[in-house]
Amino acid sequence: MAKILIAEDDENVRQFVARALAHAGHQITEAEDGGLAAEIMQEQNGAFDLLLSDIKMPVMDGIALALTVARDFPDLTVLLMTGFADQRERAHGLEALIYDVIPKPFTLQVLMEKVADALEGKPVEVVSLAKQAMNGL
């Protein structure tokens, strides 16, 4: 299936996400901070289908990582995760670089849906409207 780089400093979250996505058939590479993720990305010449990154991390945060990836590998899809509302706000205005932001905590179902949507390239607005329609909103 897809080749996914996960950048997450919380080992429990990183392992949960990695196991779930590997179980779904994806090839997973893990990095415990944004700096290491950027190094891996360069070493592998951006050979990933998706970067799934936390926003708040040591060395290089997810926003800086997304900017680096957008500069060096503009076709790579970036999906961010965060548990901090102020960090979600930092991602606003970067819609051209970032597919979406997943708020933490999230369920396995939400993770899998967001990853599938990102890999399929579904526009975020269309995805949101479809979910609202399904929920009767």
Feature annotation, model-predicted:
Residues 8:
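Conserved acidic carboxylate
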Residues 15-23:
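Charged docking surfaces used in two-component/phosphorelay signaling
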Residues 30-50:
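Acidic, metal-coordinating helix/loop segments flanking the phosphotransfer/catalytic sites
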Residues 33-36, 61-65:
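Acidic catalytic/metal-coordinating carboxylates
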Residues 57:
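Receiver (REC) domain active-site loop signature in two-component systems and cognate sites
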Residues 64, 84-102, 109, 113-114:
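Alpha4 helix (beta4-alpha4-beta5 surface) of REC/receiver domains from two-component response regulators
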Residues 106-115, 123, 127-128:
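C-terminal output helix
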